[in-house]
Amino acid sequence: MTQSGGTNTGALWGGRFASGPAAAMAALSKSTHFDWALAPYDIRASKAHARVLHKAGLLSDADLDTMLAGLDGLAADVASGAFVPAETDEDVHGALERGLIDRVGAEVGGRLRAGRSRNDQVATLFRMWLRDGVRRVAAGVLDVVDALVEQAAAHPDAVMPGKTHLQAAQPVLLAHHLLAHAHPLLRDIERLRDFDKRAAVSPYGSGALAGSSLGLDPEAIAADLDFDAAAANSIDATSARDFAAEAAFVLAMIAVDLSRMAEEVIIWSTPEFGYVTLADAWSTGSSIMPQKKNPDVSELTRGKAGRLIGNLTGLLATLKAQPLAYNRDLQEDKEPVFDSVAQLELLLPAIAGLVGTLTFHTDRMAELAPAGFTLATDIAEWLVREGVPFRVAHEAAGACVRAAEARGVGLDALTDEEFAAIDPALTPRVREVLTVQGSIASRNAKGGTAGTRVAEQLAEVRAAAQQARAWIA
């Protein structure tokens, strides 16, 4: 079988081998097409590692200066695109070592590998990249929250039909409903912040699995790279990818939360509902039907939610049967997570733009708010306040619905005599609760849809979003 080059061409191993890998083997092992994203982090970590080698007496002052200067030059060339992986480079680590040696020579450049393995190296770089990545995602999520907040603030008194099972349930304020989408997104931010605490542990210094015998200082390199601590167990540090799975879950959860909101926008924009009109900038047309205005942002959101769920399940399947410590299966850990971050970075600005430019047809929503006998619960609770047991009150309210349905009218159109015939406790005063405004105002417990409570929720969401912005910064 055809061999590709020497025993160590473009790779960080080979001395034990009499010949290089077969071409198909080299192609299978190659990862620069995706792990090049780690290059800036690799160089930053290499500089920190060089300082630790110097501290341990393994690198002279002159060699340290030469190495740091070479790494700075390499970083600039990577950023500009002047230095890219060669076809023979197996991975980002081998490519960058080649680049460093080209700049400072093999005598100095070859010293950098002492005391580190690709195992602890990639585990550290992945954490560094992901900690930055989730902050970018969090910023996009907060833009969506801000759009929801702005729409809620712009419609403080608008009412709409609240639904369960997609059936008419009770009238609510539109602002209340919009903020109900903001809260899960804020919880997603909290999950990202919580993830970051566990991701802020540096595997550097763990070597392949057993740690280092060279007197290196893992805590020093952890601090240099803005980690909170060095890993407590070198075997765990090099093989654990629960941090990646945790991040993949939160990213998928964000997509699911966005997808639920997107589904409602799709429904609301249909002629049958008529709650919203989509802005032209966030819609597309049809190649054959001139009248169409399609909710593609929302539909792509649903599609990408499935994609991110797939990334999560694929990663978990990769991890499920690996013995300790590192296994090459873990080459498959990065692409799903990289993709989840990339898809959200693409999606979130579009969702924020869509939500922020929705035109709400509040008259239509108000018209439908009492439809479907949404005030039936108010009758039952009015009876409870009159001293009627809820079981009896529930039956009476249901009978009111049945009577109104038989006549083809709303609950407020029942006569005093009809109410009294259903239950003597249903006096004319029951009409006090048979308005949408009265129903909404009565829901004044914490978290409820009364205007005063929704105003409180709006202030709380704004404050939480502002606090989350501080974490990103």
UniProtKB/Swiss-Prot annotation:
Catalysed reaction equations from the record: 2-(N(omega)-L-arginino)succinate = fumarate + L-arginine
Pathway(s) where this gene product acts: Amino-acid biosynthesis; L-arginine biosynthesis; L-arginine from L-ornithine and carbamoyl phosphate: step 3/3
Swiss-Prot/TrEMBL GO biological process terms: arginine biosynthetic process via ornithine; L-arginine biosynthetic process
UniProt subcellular location: Cytoplasm
Record keywords, A-Z: Amino-acid biosynthesis, Arginine biosynthesis, Cytoplasm, Lyase
EC number: 4.3.2.1
InterPro entries for the chain: Arg_succ_lyase_C, Argininosuccinate_lyase, Fumarase/histidase_N, Fumarate_lyase_CS, Fumarate_lyase_fam, Fumarate_lyase_N, L-Aspartase-like
One cellular component (GO) term of this entry: cytosol
GO molecular function: argininosuccinate lyase activity
Gene3D superfamilies: Fumarase/aspartase (C-terminal domain), Fumarase/aspartase (Central domain), Fumarase/aspartase (N-terminal domain)
Pfam family, any one: ASL_C2
PROSITE patterns, per database record: FUMARATE_LYASES
HAMAP family named in the record: Arg_succ_lyase
Family affiliation: Belongs to the lyase 1 family. Argininosuccinate lyase subfamily.
Protein name stated in the entry: Argininosuccinate lyase
Organism, scientific name: Nocardia farcinica (strain IFM 10152)
Recorded name of the encoding gene: argH
